[in-house]
Amino acid sequence: MWTAVKNDGPPLHYKRKIFEAENPAYAGSYCVDFVTQPFSETDETLPVRTTYFSDAEYEKFGSSDTRPMLVALHGLSGGSYEVYLKHVLAPLVGASGELQWEACVVNSRGCAFHKITSSVLFNARSTWDCRQTVKWLRKMFPNRPLFGIGFSLGANILTNVCLYT
């Protein structure tokens, strides 16, 4: 009820990357939204304050910095736009200096306005998209310590990632 009558939470801005599943057993795509600096462009097909990376932005995306990176997993039918999730991310990414974090949200298949491209959806044992994202993050940001947080079903997925990785 609280999220239905209040505003949409902290005004976080996201850039979206679409990933194609590497494992053919789980064919299809999913998306990851990365918290970014505010921008003015809009995309009516995505949640508010979310756009896709441009080719030029994506070319410059990797980094060798040591800033901590939080990987968040939303609850059932949620996404990066959820108020509860934004209230966790905002103080971390909004801090200054050495206290500032980077963050991304792994949106489960069919969530956060991402088109379903597979007959494989998600459940608590659906670790493949999160594991692929972590592998990709380690390559793009080799010096960043990675941390994870999950909410509801996302917490179950994260627990299984930790158990089976």
Residue ranges of model-derived segments:
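Residue-level signal for beta-strand positions within conserved beta-sheet cores that form or flank
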Residues: 28, 99, 144
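Alpha/beta-hydrolase active-site loop
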Residues: 120-141, 160
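Glycine-rich nucleophile elbow surrounding the catalytic serine of serine-hydrolase chemistry
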Residues: 150-161
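Phosphate/oxyanion-binding active-site loops and adjacent basic polyanion-contact surfaces
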Residues: 24-28, 80-85, 122-129
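An N-terminal hydrophobic leader/cap segment in hydrolases
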Residues: 1-63
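Short, surface-exposed "cap/lid" segments of acyl-processing enzymes
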Residues: 35-117, 136-139
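Alpha/beta-hydrolase fold nucleophile elbow
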Residues: 140-152
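Active-site signature of alpha/beta-hydrolase-fold catalytic machinery across serine-
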Residues: 87, 160-164
